[in-house]
Swiss-Prot record:
This is Sphingosine-1-phosphate transporter SPNS2. It comes from Homo sapiens. Residues 77-97 have a biased composition (Low complexity). One of its GO terms (molecular function) is sphingolipid transporter activity. It is found in: Cell membrane; Endosome membrane. The gene is SPNS2. Pfam families: MFS_1 (PF07690). One of its GO terms (cellular component) is membrane. It is linked to Deafness, autosomal recessive, 115: A form of non-syndromic deafness characterized by severe sensorineural hearing impairment in early childhood. Sensorineural deafness results from damage to the neural receptors of the inner ear, the nerve pathways to the brain, or the area of the brain that receives sound information. The keyword Transmembrane helix applies.
Length: 549
């Protein structure tokens, strides 16, 4: 009896082991079926065919949603790679682009640094340009306004092209173009100021291609918090490049003894960067990081895309808020170094410059502050947003709103402190810029969340057009115009040169407060607009495939 019981137990144990082995084989077959390359040929035990029971895709926010069922596919088709089976199936992951993603993001960020370095090199030698060409504040402000006007007109065109053609080729051609124009502008004779104005307009066209398309490539390389981090690095290039523009302009002018040489640095670096983009940046598929690969193309007309964007309330309000940021940064970036120089003339700590080369100290200090506050602001904004996302789904626009409203207070204090203390003015600039710069990367991330991949380049272009049209396209000229208008009604003196420019710049904090209100309005609609974008992505995805072997 004991032997029978032992044999029975052994047989039962063998049967249980065989059953366990059978279950393990089935699980392995199911897991192979869920994988990218094995889904079409996955087999269960005994050669039974395995068919896909469901399909899932990753959404814009990183969550996983079930895609709609569709007609069967055939072996080897792209749709087969998305098939998942059973409760033990692995979640799909975006196809890897390898280590080149980080290098590509770094090169794109470097290009953004050069764009803004070139843009603000002119501001770094603005006083020399005024003395060389004999223009007043209004004429000096025209340089930046013409640049921005051409920039905003070209941006929608490049947005359309960026959603439909090879993006890295467009980027490189844009860099090569503005580099050539900037280098040529350094040889313009003294009597042809209008040629310098025209050249800045042409540079704006070249730089529009970059600012419109580059963020969408980064958006297609990364997702979720990684995308926020990479966009933070990319948009840190704005204050970094702006600060380096002031520093480069003033330093090269001092070293060469001629401000024209300041315009010959960025073109050389631009040619190198454009070549690196052609060689090292991958030709990324639109929607790649959103688990869509080849599945998304620009299927809708440009007019339909525009209508959809205008109806997107989060996009509209965040674009208006971005316009307020552009207004303030454009005006302050253009005029603050000159304003602080005039403040020191009034305080008898500096002399009025009557012929170039003029002093470079204020541009150097302001450039260094802009670089550091840009880094601090972008890091602080990204970190605050990641922490607040754990508390609320509306974290992105709320962090932007707090930064804007806080910045307005310290921008106001700049003009109070500058009357008696330059150090106090620099402290207010430091805090105000840090808070103002905290929203750049977050605003770009808001756009990525609420706009589907096939419309992102168009969305960036339209947002760029709007922000420049309502922002820095007119703010430098407007500030110069108001300053000259006030000076015409007063006696010509260093005191009124200082006061008139300060009164004109007081317009900036009020616009910044308005921008904070627009970010609060964005928070009201952000959650629903993001959910709608995720739903549209799922509808655009190609139908899943299930194959019976």
């Amino acid at each position: 009896m004991m032997c029978l019981e032992c044999a029975s137990a052994a047989a039962g144990g063998a049967e249980e082991e065989e059953a366990d082995a059978e279950r393990r084989r089935r699980r392995r077959g199911a897991q192979r079926g869920a994988g990218g390359s094995g889904c079409c040929g996955a087999r269960g035990a005994g050669g039974a065919g395995v068919s896909a029971a469901g399909d899932e895709v990753q959404t814009l926010s990183g969550s996983v949603r079930r895609a709609p069922t569709g007609p069967p596919g055939t072996p080897g088709t792209p749709g087969c790679a998305a098939t998942a089976k059973g409760p033990g199936a692995q979640q799909p992951k975006p196809a890897s682009l390898g280590r080149g993603r980080g290098a590509a993001a770094a090169i794109l960020s470097l290009g953004n640094v050069l764009n803004y370095l070139d843009r603000y090199t002119v501001a770094g030698v603005l006083l020399d340009i005024q003395q060389h060409f004999g223009v007043k504040d209004r004429g000096a402000g025209l340089l930046q306004s013409v640049f921005i006007c051409s920039f905003m007109v070209a941006a929608p065109i490049f947005g359309y092209l960026g959603d439909r053609f090879n993006r890295k080729v467009i980027l490189s051609c844009g860099i090569f173009f503005w580099s050539a124009v900037t280098f040529s502008s350094s040889f313009i004779p003294q009597q042809y100021f209008w040629l310098l104005v025209l050249s800045r307009g042409l540079v704006g066209i070249g730089e529009a291609s970059y600012s419109t398309i580059a963020p969408t490539i980064i958006g297609d390389l990364f997702t979720k918090n990684t995308r926020t981090l990479m966009l933070s690095v990319f948009y840190f290039a704005i204050p970094l490049g702006s600060g380096l523009g002031y520093i480069t302009g003033s330093s090269v002018k001092q070293a060469a003894g001629d401000w024209h040489w300041a315009l010959r640095v960025s073109p050389v670096l631009g040619m190198i960067t454009g070549t690196l983009i052609l060689i090292l940046v991958p030709a990324t598929k639109r929607g790649h990081a959103d688990q869509l690969g080849d599945q998304l193309k620009a299927r809708t007309s440009w007019l339909r895309d525009m209508k959809a964007l205008i109806r997107n309330r989060s996009y509209v309000f965040s674009s208006l808020a971005t316009s307020a940021v552009s207004f303030a940064t454009g005006a302050l970036g253009m005029w603050i170094p000159l304003y602080l120089h005039r403040a020191q003339v009034v305080q008898k700590t500096a002399e009025t410059c009557n012929s170039p080369p003029c002093g470079a100290k204020d541009s150097l200090i302001f450039g260094a502050i802009t670089c550091f506050t840009g880094f601090l602001g972008v890091v602080t904004g990204a970190g605050a947003t990641r922490w607040c996302r754990l508390k609320t789904q509306r974290a992105d626009p709320l962090v932007c709103a707090v930064g804007m409203l806080g910045s307005a207070i310290f921008i106001c204090l700049i003009f109070v402190a500058a009357k008696s203390s330059i150090v106090g003015a620099y402290i207010c600039i430091f805090v105000g810029e840090t808070l103002l710069f905290s929203n750049w990367a977050i605003t770009a991330d808001i756009l990525m969340y609420v706009v589907i991949p096939t419309r992102r380049a168009t969305a960036v272009a339209l947002q760029s057009f709007t922000s420049h049209l309502l922002g820095d396209a007119g703010s430098p000229y407007l500030i110069g115009f108001i300053s000259d208008l006030i000076r015409q009604s007063t006696k010509d003196s260093p005191l009124w040169e200082f006061l008139s420019l300060g009164y004109a710049l007081m317009l900036c904090p009020f616009v910044v407060v308005l921008g904070g209100m627009f970010f609060l309005a964005t928070a009201l609609f952000f959650v629903s607009d993001r959910a709608r974008a995720e739903q549209q992505v799922n509808q655009l995805a190609m139908p899943p495939a299930s194959v019976k072997v």
